[in-house]
Structure formats: structure tokens, C-alpha cells
Amino acid sequence: MLRVTIRHYYDFGTDRAIVGDDLVRPDAWDRLRTKTSGVFAIPPTREEFVQTAEGRADIAGRARAIDAWLEGRGARVVASYGVGGAALEWWLHKLRPRRKLIVTDYGEGTVQRLVETFPEVVVRYHDLRRDEPLAADVHLFHRIDTELGNREWQEVFTRFARVPILVVATEVLDLRRLLLELRLRRRMKLRHATKAGYIRSSAAFEALWRPTHTSHPIRMHDLSSWELRPRAVGRTDSARGLSHTYEPLPERRVRTRAAEPSDVIDHLRKGDRTVGGLSRHDEGGLQRPDP
């Protein structure tokens, strides 16, 4: 499939009044994590936090796959970014408690809640949009790909150009999903869905890090993933503050009207495009984001 990036929307139901019209902001995520009680919330007590994490069999299987991969690479220190509810990180710690695990988020309320409920790990405030990588053997980007636009991600990979990364994708866009997203856009035009970032095709993912990293596609249990290795070999790690000179690739974007299937074909024929889309978690088997 060609390089395609589409805007993603999510219907939070009654929680939309708490989240607002755009999820991809630290204050919106904080409200969703600490002011709601649904699947996205971080439980307020340690007991509830553990109970919630242990109940996620899907995440447990994914964590085992990631743990095995980390062990195969001898990773003693792992930094996981934008962890949110941190169910995956709880499983990673349970599976390998001697491995140092640093978890980060850019919502201050989320960070505070994690400090209170997940004392076994190191919790740090970190904003991927501007901060340098932390000191770690491997840097884990687990289901945070929807959070940033293409140009923002290219800037992230430029700052992380000297470090190895494991990218575990929220979802990889294929033609079937693209058609479904665009059809749903018409049906939900008048609904109050919240902007929830972007979803991408495999080619669009790989274009983000091509200037800075080589990549190898792998499968982490239920999700498509990539192992990224720095192109710059034998130079100072970017976690030590070295500046970079990589030039981000330009981002091209096209807006569509209420889309028909013919629109999709037109966009695909034109090559790398960003198009508008709308999805809902309870229709058509669409992906529900992990908390």
C-alpha cells in the first residue's frame, strides 16, 4: 500500500464532555485518565491498578513477546514513552522485575497517578514533542503512533537518531480499513466525535524514520511492530545531548469532502496523501485503543 495517513476520530460517548474535541493534548489525556472510570482511566488505588492490569490478557501476551525481544537484545534498562495507563509496563515489570523500567508521560496528572500506583518503576515527565531521549538501552514506543502528525514524528526520530527503538503500532492502515473509515465519516458527520490523532499505512510509518533509522518489521503478539536501529553508527548517543542535522521529510496533506469509495482510489493513485477520516469504536469492529 502507498503512503497514506488519515486523521482519526473517536466517539467517547458521555466522556466527551470531559475530554473535549481534541484528545491529543496533555490536559485532555489527564482528564481522561484521572476524571473518568472507563477503559482509559488509571485506577486511583494500587489495588485497582494491579487488578486492572492483570485482567488484560491481550496485553499480557503482547508483553511476553516484547519481553522476549528485549531479553534477546540484552536490554537492562528500558524507557517506555507515553505509557498512559501503563498496563503493558506493569506486565513487563512482572515478567522481568530485575530489568530497570522507566515510564513516561506528558500529562502531569497522569504522571502523579502513576507515581502513586506503580512504585516499582521510575516515573518521569517527558514530552516527546520536544524532549531528548532518556538514558536507556532500548526505547519503547508502544501504541503512541496516533499521537503526532508526520512532521512531528520526523522531528522525534531526528532527536532519537542515535538510539535503538521498538515501535509497536496502534494499528496499520490497509485498504479495507481506509474504505471503512471514509464511509463512516459520512455517517458520523453530525456526531460529536473527538479528534484522536492519526492512523497510517505501513509505508507511511516507514517513511517517518527512514532518514535516521533502518527498520525490520516484526510481530509483537497481536500488533505490527518495527525494530529501529540508528543509521549513525559509532557516534555519541542522543541521550547525552548531541544535536542532529537530519532534515525532516515534508508532510503533504489533502482534505476530502464526505468521502465515497471513489475518493479513496483517487488518493491512492496520487501517491502519498493525508486524507480525512472518522471512526467509532462500536461500529464495524473498529479498533479500541488500549488504555
What annotation goes with each model-predicted range?
Residues 1-76, 81-120, 125-132, 151, ...:
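Class I (Rossmann-like) S-adenosyl-L-methionine-dependent methyltransferase catalytic domain
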Residues 147-160:
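A short, conserved alpha-helix within the catalytic core of class I
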Residues 290-291:
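Short, intrinsically disordered, low-complexity terminal/loop segments
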